[in-house]
């Protein structure tokens, strides 16, 4: 009986040691997986940047605009020095809030261009789809990091444009601001990745 008890204890100890070994070997891979996720976030943002740049190549946007129709677009801080002072959780939360704001603005623009039967409708629909995908990816990282969600206020949108040139100006302003955001956000994601444990 004693021999049986000793054998059972040895077997249990062996199983526990095996499980601990598996956990220990799996843990170092976790930071690498998170780093890969941040590469994905940066790549998704760069893809959105390219979509925005392609839309802005349209000759209709060649004219400079000097007034602001959108009062609630996120303020973009694009100083290189700001990258060195980023805090992980607050930055994720702010990027999420900014993306949600741009999503609301682009959905408004998409509805407006549909009414005007504008040629950019298919590309705007594609862009909104990619924005939603980036938001979902960012949400997953926020959940892992336990980053809080900042309340996103309802956007202050301009009146529905009555003329084609108003649609053009609204599109141009929104795309130019989003181009700045995407360029900044892609740098931010790479900076945050560098702050992760190796």
Model-derived regions: residue spans:
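Leu/Val/Ala/Ile-rich N-terminal alpha-helices, chiefly Sec-type signal peptides and the beginnings
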Residues: 2-84
